[in-house]
Amino acid sequence: MASFIWVQLKKTSEVDLAKPLVKFIQQTYPSGGEEQAQYCRAAEELSKLRRSALGRPLDKHEGALETLLRYYDQICSIEPKFPFSENQICLTFTWKDAFDKGSLFGGSVKLALASLGYEKSCVLFNCAALASQIAAEQNLDNDEGLKTAAKQYQFASGAFLHIKDTVLSALSREPTVDISPDTVGTLSLIMLAQAQEVFFLKATRDKMKDAIIAKLANQAADYFGDAFKQCQYKDALPKYFYFQEVFPTLAAKQCIMQANAEYHQSILAKQQKKFGEEIARLQHAAELIKNVASRYDEYVNVKDFSDKINRALAAAKKDNDFIYHDRVPDLKDLDPIGKATLVKPTPVNVPISQKFTDLFEKMVPVSVQQSLAVFSQRKADLVNRSIAQMREATTLANGVLASLNLPAAIEDVSGDTVPQSILTKSTAVVEQGGIQTVDQLIKELPELLQRNREILEESLRLLDEEEATDNDLRAKFKDRWQRTPSNDLYKPLRAEGAKFRAVLDKAVQADGQVKERYQSHRDTIALLCKPEPELNAAIPSANPAKTMQGSEVVNVLKSLLSNLDEIKKEREGLENDLKSVNFDMTSKFLTALAQDGVINEEALSVTELDRIYGGLTTKVQESLKKQEGLLKNIQVSHQEFSKMKQSNSEASLREEVLKNLATAYDNFVELVANLKEGTKFYNELTEILVRFQNKCSDIVFARKTERDELLKDLQQSIAREPSAPSIPPPAYQSSPAGGHATAPTPAPRTMPPAKPQPPARPPPPVLPANRVPPAAAATAPAGVGTASAAPPQTPGSAPPPQAQGPPYPTYPGYPGYCQMPMPMGYNPYTYGQYNMPYPPVYHQSPGQAPYPGPQQPTYPFPQPPQQSYYPQQ
């Protein structure tokens, strides 16, 4: 029986999985937390698992296969949890073609891609290949070996079939030949056929009914036939099928399985007293086995089976001739043998390994992470919008009060002292550092801005340089430069960079507005920073208005202002409540993903935000409406208060100064808040830009690594290309052997007199007719013709050793010299004394018999003499 077919493993380059995964984990999860530390340890374990599965030779044992399967399950598990792509987590996986042996000038074909799908396909290929090797190593003389072999062949068939269905969608370009759909589809058929063969062997060993065995064998022959047909697509499949015994082995096994089917069906025919059918089937089986023995004897040994069939055939013929005299039907008249399949490709359902434990079990998928990020943004927008509304309302209220000089107007009834509200504001400004604080904050802004600009420009410069290099190489190698253009790959990063640049431009405008407002109120703010005596001296005095003290309108204004202060305090509490709300949407998103397969983030987020923030946003709106009513009442009461006040220029001037001081305080508070917020913004933006720079640096480094690998592969492929096209043979050598057309005789050429003639050399010895070399009887190789002018061959005479050449000198350096193409079997090392760079051509005088070549048993066809023969002058 023929040996079983197994598949070689693919080889890969080492990849550090831990570093990029740890970097992503550190950027995504809070630093210092147990969750981050746990995931970082898991990333290290994953990198070790890859080295264990792919970084060392594997034994042909199920334990080694278990390691491969665990790694495959793990990368399938992490695929939805990490954003593996060229512009996010960029991991370049390099794999060599399993069937390509390379060349003298370069290694085997390999492909490097930044695709986890590519890694999955290659790892699954190795799982299937190792399963085929394990099955081929089994002892098929016991049930355990048969069971293991059948199981592993069916798994290998299913794995190859899975690659066939998924490889094109997993890769962004054409795969190497070994994992192309045609190749893995054929391998799947081969593995399935061998699994069926194992069941046939099991049925034979258990001595099951011949009808069942015949059907199993016939189905196996069918599978082997399908695989044999697939292998005939030479351009689509690797050389593996033609140079490592697969192609002839498949052909032999198809015939052997068909012969087994006929043999066991003949036994069934004998049992049914159909002796003619028995003989016909045995004859067909004998023909099939004879064909195998004659064509594929090098690969299979069918002597025992052949003897078994021949004995059965001889006995059947003898019995039929002497006893039954049953007519032997033609093969085409026989009923077809049925088929019974007991095998099918094992589907690939993750996890495949029975011992798989997910290292990142608690990590949520990327889709959930993305939904959480969008939800966090929605939450931040809602909170910021509510807080902004309250702050704007407070600013509006302060502005209205400042324009009305309240509460200073109702406190300043004496007209010659600083109102208490102004003193309070002055004290607050001094405690916060006064104008020195504002000056220092404004001074720091340009430095922070410049730092962020430099980080952003450096990040974009890295992309520009790599893209320019990629464009240069693409222009140089044209279609050979097969990788994603940097211009397309960097579009998301450039869009992100443009967004950061726009943010910085807006920040510059905001900084300008803050500085402009500060300059317009700087003097008044400086006045608030002065001690009380200086402040009192700077405020004009007015006539006393003691009669207004305790009036009804003043009491109404005080009550309204007190209510407004209460609203402001409530807003501070609401703002803290809005900021302090904290809840996790992970469980809801995971539940939705498990139930529906997708996450409707918008619907879930809006519903949950309304539930949690609905009460707080209602209070915010009530606060805004209450303030609106209070401001209207304050303005009405202030009009009455203004009518009651004594009207003079000094009072008006004093009121104007007090208004400016109140406005200056409000602007100071707002300026300090804006400047601190701007400083915080720039510092946070620096962290974001540093991450952006790291992202750009990582992808540029990965692209450079990919570029170096691609350049190396291109250099090797260029080195493997022929340096010059092959020279076609002369016309007189391309004529068919044995043809009757007379080769045209070229015109005689005159040799220049200045050239010395070569010295005469003796002719080679002539061998007697009874010493014809054995190689002389070999058939001349294709493409070497025989001139029609040669004398006809007689039995026992030596054939001409070479086609007759032109009757002019062919020695290098002489006119008319033309180097002849080497024969396909030429090997200069078979010559003992001369290593000639071209095959010599014999010349003879008209009528002279050709010279036979010396005997060289190791040469597959007649050899010319080792010295050129020159015509005697």
Curated annotation (Swiss-Prot):
It comes from the Eukaryota. Expressed in astrocytes and glioma cells. Residues 802-811 are annotated as: Interaction with CEP55. CDD domains: BRO1_Alix, V_Alix. Residues 508-873 are annotated as: Self-association. It holds the Pfam family BRO1. Its main location: cytoplasm. Residues 423-873 are annotated as: Interaction with SDCBP. PROSITE patterns: BRO1. The keyword Ribonucleoprotein does not apply. Residues 176-508 are annotated as: Interaction with CHMP4A, CHMP4B and CHMP4C. This is Programmed cell death 6-interacting protein. It comes from Rattus norvegicus.
